[in-house]
Design a protein with these regions (language model features):
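C-terminal regulatory or interaction extensions
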Residues: 1-70
Length: 70
């Protein structure tokens, strides 16, 4: 589950992303970084973590990867 494998900060950030995804279909790491005011690599790590715990799903190759709600 999300709470076991993530810090409170990560969970809070994922909530922001999920909120964004209620309005938009997809998000990428650049947009997530902007939204969370973090570096792009931090955002990508967070997105892939969210995918690992099955909160998000992704499509596309690394460079153009987008994430959406499961």
């Amino acid at each position: 589950s999300m709470s076991e494998s993530m810090s409170e900060l990560e969970i809070a950030r994922i909530q922001v992303i999920l909120q964004y995804l209620t309005v938009h279909d997809t998000i990428n790491s650049a947009k997530a970084a902007e939204l969370l005011d973090v570096e792009k690599k931090t955002a990508s790590r967070l997105l892939s973590k969210a995918e690992k715990v099955e909160v998000l799903i992704s499509k596309g190759k690394t460079k153009d990867k987008v994430y959406m709600k499961k």
